[in-house]
Design a protein with these regions (language model features):
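Nucleotide/phosphate-binding sheet-loop regions of phosphoryl- and nucleotidyl-transfer enzymes
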Residues: 1-224
C-alpha cells in the first residue's frame, strides 16, 4: 500500500532531544501524506472521504513482537460517519473504530492492565458480548460496537485523566512516538542483547494506507 518512511535519523534525534521531533519533520510529513492521498484518492482527516493509516516499526533487523503498531489511525466521531457512507457497512466501520481506540489507548496512551488486573478494554468487550448473548467479537452488532467506542473512551478518560485525541494529526504524532519509544522498551532491549543487534541503530517508522482484514469472512491480511 501507498506510504512513506520516517527514518532512523529522526529516531536518533528523538532520543537525543528529550523525545522531541526535528522542526522540519512536520512539513515533510505533510508533503508525504499529500502524495499518499493522491495515490489512494482519499484525504487524511477528511470526514467525507477519509484516509486511514497504519503506523509500524521499520527496524533494520526483524524483531518480531517487540515493536509497537497502531492500525486504523485517523478516525474520530466525525470522520466515522464519512467512513460509513463511503463503505456502506456500519458494522465494519464501528469494528474498525473500536479496534483503533483500543490499540491507541494501549500502545500510545499507556492504558494497560496493572499486575493481575484484567485488561480494561477486553473486560468491556467481554461484558458487551455477554449482554448481547454472543460468543464471538464478529457477532456484535454495529450498535453494540458503537457503544463500545464510547465506553473505551470513557475508561481512558477515567483512568488516565485525559481525553482520547480526536485530531488525526495529533493521533499520528502520538503513534510515531510510541513506535520510537518501543525501541527502548524492556522486551526490545533484551531481544537485541540476545540477538546481537546494536542499540544505536534505532528504528524507522513506516506509515501506510490501511489494508483491512476484518471486512468479512473472505478478508485477511498478513505480514511477510
Amino acid at each position: 500500500p501507498a506510504g512513506f518512511t520516517i527514518t532512523t535519523e529522526v529516531c536518533t534525534y528523538y532520543y537525543d532531544h528529550k523525545k522531541k521531533y526535528p522542526r522540519e519533520l512536520n512539513g515533510q510529513i505533510d508533503r508525504a501524506i499529500k502524495e499518499v492521498e493522491k495515490t489512494m484518492g482519499a484525504k487524511f482527516g477528511d470526514p467525507k472521504n477519509p484516509l486511514l493509516l497504519s503506523v509500524r516499526s521499520g527496524a533494520r533487523a526483524s524483531m518480531p513482537g517487540m515493536m509497537e503498531t497502531v492500525l486504523n489511525l485517523g478516525l474520530n466521531d466525525e470522520i466515522i460517519t464519512g467512513l460509513i457512507k463511503k463503505s456502506g457497512d456500519p458494522r465494519f466501520c464501528y469494528d474498525v473504530y473500536r479496534r483503533f481506540v483500543q490499540m491507541y489507548g494501549d500502545v500510545v496512551m499507556g492504558l494497560r492492565p496493572e499486575g493481575v488486573e484484567i485488561d480494561p478494554f477486553e473486560h468491556l468487550l467481554e461484558k458487551k458480548k455477554h449482554k448481547h448473548g454472543v460468543e464471538l467479537d464478529n457477532e456484535l452488532s454495529a450498535e453494540a460496537l458503537e457503544e463500545l467506542v464510547g465506553e473505551f473512551k470513557a475508561v481512558i478518560k477515567k483512568r488516565l485523566k485525559r481525553n482520547f485525541p480526536e485530531d488525526p494529526k495529533e493521533q499520528l504524532y502520538g503513534a510515531v512516538g510510541a513506535v520510537f519509544s518501543s525501541w527502548q522498551g524492556d522486551r526490545a532491549i533484551r531481544y537485541r542483547e540476545i540477538e546481537g543487534i546494536p542499540h544505536e541503530w534505532g528504528t524507522a517508522v513506516n506509515v501506510q494506507s490501511m489494508v483491512y482484514g476484518n471486512m468479512g469472512d473472505d478478508c485477511a491480511t498478513g505480514v511477510a
